């Protein structure tokens, strides 16, 4: 019965993508030292989509590290100078010359496992929640209890002035599959992994130093627009 419910949830959550975007979404292939990850970019976040496509076509992501990896949370990449980092260097703070206005399409796009979202500076210095020009993360996350989700909803209500409410089907997804719901409605989710979640899993389990940088470099060898 539990597996049936989970299968139904996955089907329901995928329906909008299949019905509306199956033939129109751009796709990018990330060839990494841990394996390949294929992602789709959402058309409802056009500024992030177009920026990501532009950077990919310029070769911006070729050679950059996954510089911040936290198990049962996410893997982050996109720091322009990380490709030149020496072992043990702290990376992730390279200067950026622009930001992308937030395109938070919640609750349609949420921090499910496999979500691709834009990193950003904290609310204190970035109240508009504008996104990093290049850094992004892929969600792994964990399963959550009802008590955990109740607490997250309280924090979400406060962070969004009561504008965001977690739908019942998302609560079930977070309980059955997992993700990072505490980031919902506050960070721009602009894509999702189509293939290669086993690679994401492999990366999120690697040994890291005190700065969450993998002890053995994991990098994007090449990023290519494939659709």
Which residues make up each language-model segment?
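Bacterial Sec-dependent N-terminal signal peptides
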Residues: 1-22
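Cyclophilin-like peptidyl-prolyl cis-trans isomerases
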Residues: 17-227
């Amino acid at each position: 019965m539990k597996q049936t419910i989970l299968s139904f949830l996955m089907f329901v959550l995928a329906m909008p993508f299949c019905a509306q975007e199956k033939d129109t979404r751009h796709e990018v292939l990330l060839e990494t030292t841990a394996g390949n990850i294929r992602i789709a970019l959402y058309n409802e976040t056009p500024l992030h989509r177009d920026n990501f496509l532009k950077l990919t076509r310029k070769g911006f992501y070729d050679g950059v590290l996954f510089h911040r990896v936290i198990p049962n949370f996410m893997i982050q990449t996109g720091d322009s100078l990380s490709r030149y980092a020496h072992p043990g260097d702290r990376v992730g703070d390279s200067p950026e010359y622009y930001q992308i206005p937030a395109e938070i399409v919640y609750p349609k796009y949420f921090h499910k496992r496999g979500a691709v979202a834009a990193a950003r500076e904290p609310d204190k210095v970035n109240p508009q929640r504008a996104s990093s020009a290049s850094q992004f993360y892929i969600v792994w996350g964990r399963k959550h209890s009802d008590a955990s989700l109740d607490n997250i909803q309280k924090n979400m209500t406060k962070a969004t002035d009561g504008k965001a409410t977690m739908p019942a089907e998302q609560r079930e997804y977070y309980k059955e599959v997992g993700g990072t719901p505490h980031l919902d409605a506050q960070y721009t989710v602009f894509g999702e992994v189509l293939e290669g979640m086993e690679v994401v899993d492999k990366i999120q389990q690697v040994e890291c130093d005190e700065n969450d940088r993998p002890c053995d470099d994991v990098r994007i060898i090449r990023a290519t627009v494939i659709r």
